Amino acid sequence: MAKEEPQSISRDLQELQKKLSLLIDSFQNNSKVVAFMKSPVGQYLDSHPFLAFTLLVFIVMSAVPVGFFLLIVVLTTLAALLGVIILEGLVISVGGFSLLCILCGLGFVSLAMSGMMIASYVVVSSLISCWFSPRPLTQQNTSCDFLPAMKSAEFEGLYQE
């Protein structure tokens, strides 16, 4: 039963990899994505993946504050139609300044988060490739051993007096 579990995990990972590759292929073959990737902005972001990932994280994280800001703008515009023009200017100014502060903070947070996510992706992918590699057991121990192995002669020489 213990031998069947790693094979099951490996098979599940292969199925997941096939599904993800099909999803990525369907996304990359979309006509709008192809048109964007041929544009200068798409080519620049393709050559700078960290910047593209940071931009994606920033856009996702800034959706809620921008939505709240637009809601406040619409509500104050409706209030202005009722005669509260000075209040609208004040609220939009304060809201715009608040949005600027929030978006600057989200920019720094998204930069830090994308850096941590990419670093954790590199670490996890290297650990997974080390743990689940299809190499024989003898090769796997030598290539993924994080502690250096000491020869027995060196070990005995350390403790002789």
From Swiss-Prot:
Nucleotide-binding listed as a keyword: no
GO cellular component, one term: endoplasmic reticulum membrane
Membrane topology, Lumenal segments: 62-67, 111-116
Keyword Protease: no
Short name of one Pfam family: Promethin
Main location group: endoplasmic reticulum
Positions of transmembrane segments: 44-61, 68-87, 94-110, 117-133
GO biological-process terms attached to the record: lipid droplet formation
Mode of membrane association: Multi-pass membrane protein
Organ and tissue specificity: Expressed at high levels in the heart and skeletal muscle. Expressed at low levels in kidney, small intestine, lung and liver.
Keywords attached to this entry: Endoplasmic reticulum, Lipid droplet, Membrane, Transmembrane, Transmembrane helix
Cellular compartment(s): Endoplasmic reticulum membrane; Lipid droplet
Topology feature Cytoplasmic, residues: 1-43, 88-93, 134-161
InterPro entries with a match to the protein in the record: LDAF1
Function recorded in the entry: Plays an important role in the formation of lipid droplets (LD) which are storage organelles at the center of lipid and energy homeostasis. In association with BSCL2/seipin, defines the sites of LD formation in the endoplasmic reticulum.
Similarity field: Belongs to the LDAF1 family.
Quaternary structure (record): Interacts with isoform 1 and isoform 3 of BSCL2/seipin to form an oligomeric complex.
Protein known as: Lipid droplet assembly factor 1
